[in-house]
């Protein structure tokens, strides 16, 4: 199902809670794909789990003690550690949080006739109600968007759109949906 209408928090076998930021969604797989790898890392920045190439991107949020999990866990809710706001165990995650930062750009339509084939465009701005977000756009051999990676998450966004023309790509024959 669509990432937007799904539950997307997971508790792994080490009691680490992660949020799914990308579920393998692409123009070819608009509803995503099954996850094949368990996210087990505690890195502060989002990353893929494992080596399957399932297209998932995970962000580690926190680790919860089994004793706290047992009290409040359900299929509808995921408990947060009781000392989340003050405890040192999760301070690095709290300190790394950016209100309204953009972590992922979803490609819904790759477009047609975009720029130069096999070229990478850097510092492409993400316009919206926040500021500072940028991404790198890779145009594939078919002159379509091959990938988009956020390189600066910016802050204070509630929505954003990749501005490919301001990023140096010439006006395409058909605009992509990002």
What kind of region is each of these model predictions?
Residues 54-178:
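Conserved, function-critical positions that sit in or immediately flank catalytic
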């Amino acid at each position: 199902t669509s990432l937007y209408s799904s539950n997307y928090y997971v508790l792994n076998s080490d009691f680490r809670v992660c949020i799914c930021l990308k579920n393998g969604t692409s123009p070819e797989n608009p509803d995503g794909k099954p996850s094949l790898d368990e996210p087990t890392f505690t890195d502060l920045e989002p990353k893929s789990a494992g080596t399957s190439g399932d297209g998932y991107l995970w962000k580690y949020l926190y680790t919860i003690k089994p004793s706290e999990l047992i009290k409040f866990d359900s299929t509808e809710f995921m408990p947060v550690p009781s000392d989340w706001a003050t405890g040192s165990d999760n301070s690095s995650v709290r300190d790394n949080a950016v209100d309204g930062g953009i972590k992922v750009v979803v490609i819904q339509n790759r477009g047609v006739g975009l720029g130069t084939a096999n070229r990478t465009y850097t510092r492409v701005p993400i316009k919206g109600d926040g500021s500072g977000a940028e991404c790198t756009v890779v145009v594939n051999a078919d002159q379509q968007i091959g990938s988009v990676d956020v390189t600066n998450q910016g802050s204070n966004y509630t929505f954003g759109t990749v501005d490919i023309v301001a990023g140096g790509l010439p006006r395409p024959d058909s605009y992509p949906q990002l």
